[in-house]
From Swiss-Prot:
Any Pfam family: MatK_N
Protein name as catalogued: Maturase K
GO cellular component terms listed in the entry, alphabetical order: chloroplast
Function of the protein: Usually encoded in the trnK tRNA gene intron. Probably assists in splicing its own and other chloroplast group II introns.
Primary gene name: matK
Length: 499
């Protein structure tokens, strides 16, 4: 980000925040190569080294200064040569540079807003597992939940128009339209849903920026409605790209209001609605009446229809009671369960039995989808019976065990937050037995003969890491107690969830 600041200052005074001239700067493509999501494009697809790739960029910039070389007809073939290279690659190089240039002012704006508010970043909250402790703290006291999937834009122009208030120069809009419409014309037979998937794979940096800004526009309604509902003068929240910044700003606002409006502090510490999002899936939850939740639902529907031109039926957004329905989020089925307890109280000669009911959040592993995924990867059949992995049978014993261990370790690492570990143990059992069958297949033996020859020590590595983690949590407990430990463990080093 410091590199962004240095380079942008060189052009800001002359170009007045215009982004279009930045695509003629070589350092933009250098930043795209170093920082890009698709940094291997210029190397792997062409077989050139870094110097040759930068030479291609210099030649492209030289040709762009010449007349009519930036505009390519949509009717041309994909294999029209430009400097001897594929036309798709040419557009991809330019789109990478354009994506970097359009990211710079928004990133700098975000950093400046954080410095003004003096917000301390907490890197632990970047973990997606930090959402579940939030669920445990808040959701037992809530009544209703609604899971909402943010719709994809149905037209390319919507992606362009979301930037109209933030980018000043019209040339950048025309260039963005050129990338989107030209690519869409090349793939005119592809449906819009498949086109979005294809575009996200071919131009990930540009797609992620456009989609994140699109989601940011969608989430702006929550700040607007919060201001209208509270009847208090709140400072503007600006553009928030990450959940941690949104959460931190809300906390900072609570501290400010604590000095000026002490009587209304509870309104912000215990807000009337909670909103959590990961990628395109969001959760709305509240302890108010269904009427209040329905108002929020229609706010969202009218926002989609009037601002994004996306038609959505109200019946597709369901409002459910947390005590009766579970919701799926980040690989877990979660619901609020009533946990009854009986306490015997004695006062002098009289004794009383007090029944107490507490709400507790349950997080359950979706065992059936996981078994389907394992069956698709040929670790088991559709019924969950382990089978061998013939593709790996040609590898060494160490590589086979290491591959199974890596998969088992990742699943155990992510799903250790489950309330019921039986499903997790079943998945690990499938992987262990599949590993044994693969080794037995390689050595042309049966499972029983193979285990008799090597002993059960061959599978002890599957348990080693989990015991080490539990020993850190319960350092004074015996190994037997550690094995019987069934508490939930949330890790703060998981940054993404591969769906």
């Amino acid at each position: 980000m410091k590199e962004f600041q240095v380079y942008l200052e060189l052009d800001r005074s002359r170009q007045h925040d215009f982004l279009y001239p930045l695509i003629f700067r070589e350092y933009i493509y250098a930043l795209a190569y170093d920082h890009g999501l698709n940094s291997s494009i210029l190397v792997e697809n062409l077989g050139y080294d870094n110097k040759s790739s930068l030479l291609i960029v210099k030649r492209l910039i030289t040709r762009m200064y010449q007349q009519n070389h930036l505009i390519l007809s949509a009717n041309d073939s994909n294999k029209n040569q430009f400097l001897g290279y594929n036309k798709n690659l040419y557009s991809q190089i330019i789109s990478e540079g354009f994506a970097v240039s359009v990211e710079i002012p928004f990133s700098l704006q975000l950093i400046s807003s954080l410095e003004e508010e003096e917000i301390v970043k907490s890197y632990n909250l970047r973990s997606i597992h930090s959402i579940f402790p939030f669920f445990e703290d808040k959701f037992p006291y809530l009544n209703y939940v609604s899971d909402v999937r943010i719709p994809y834009p149905i037209h390319l122009e919507i992606l362009v128009q979301t930037l109209r208030y933030w980018v000043k120069d019209a040339s950048s809009f025309h260039l963005l339209r050129l990338f989107l419409y030209e690519y869409f014309n090349w793939n005119s037979l592809i449906t819009p849903k498949k086109w979005i998937s294809t575009f996200s794979q071919s131009n990930p940096r540009l797609f992620l920026f456009l989609y994140n800004f699109y989601v940011c526009e969608y989430e702006s309604i929550f700040i607007f409605l919060r201001k209208k509902s509270s009847y208090l003068r709140l400072t503007s929240s600006g553009v928030l790209f990450e959940r941690i910044y949104f959460y931190a700003k809300i906390e900072h606002r609570v501290e400010v209001l604590d000095k000026d409006f002490p009587s209304t502090l509870w309104f912000f510490k215990d807000p009337f609605i909670h909103y959590v999002r990961y990628k395109g899936k969001s959760i709305l939850s509240s302890k108010n009446t269904p009427f209040f939740m329905n108002k929020w639902k229609y706010y969202l529907i009218h926002l989609w229809q009037c601002h994004f031109y996306v038609w959505s039926q109200p019946g597709k957004i369901h409002i459910n009671q947390l005590s009766e329905h579970s919701f799926y989020f980040l690989g877990y089925f979660s619901n609020v369960r009533l946990n009854p307890s009986v306490v015997r109280s004695q006062m002098l000669e009289n004794s009383f039995i007090i029944e107490n009911v507490m709400k507790k959040l349950d997080t359950i592993i979706p065992i059936i989808p996981l078994i389907r995924s394992l069956a698709k990867a040929n670790f088991c059949n559709v019924l969950g019976h382990p089978i061998s992995k013939p593709v790996w049978a040609d590898s060494s014993d160490f590589d086979i065990i290491d591959r199974f261990l890596r998969i088992c370790r990742n699943l155990s690492h992510y799903y250790n937050g489950s309330s019921k570990k039986k499903s997790l143990y079943r998945i690990k059992y499938i992987l262990r037995l599949s590993c044994i069958k693969t080794l037995a297949r390689k050595h042309k033996s049966t499972v029983r003969v193979f285990l008799k020859r090597l002993g059960s020590e061959v599978l002890e590595e599957f348990f080693t890491e989990e015991e080490e983690i539990l020993s850190l949590i319960l350092p004074r407990a015996s190994s037997t107690l550690q094995r019987l430990y069934r508490g939930r463990i949330w890790y703060l080093d998981i940054f993404y969830f591969h769906q």
